[in-house]
């Protein structure tokens, strides 16, 4: 079982990655009408799994999305980005709740 510091570290990495993902989504939406713009996404799930398996640090990566391009070369789908934004928001709330729970447990352990 992971200790509190490890759990908090994993949750912190997750929250940081979700913030990066939100920034990428916002950037994609801002460029929905920019000719030639290629949407990006942040991948961290595989990095987190590898770091947990190896016991090392995890890093999020920003990679281009492989969607089909429109005639102007832009591959941003507004409906996809809006859906991703909602999913990201729910994931952020879940991680935030888990982090609050961890701090509550630590507080209870300290104060008795």
Q: Where in the sequence are the language-model features?
A:
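Amphipathic alpha-helical polymerization modules
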Residues: 1-112
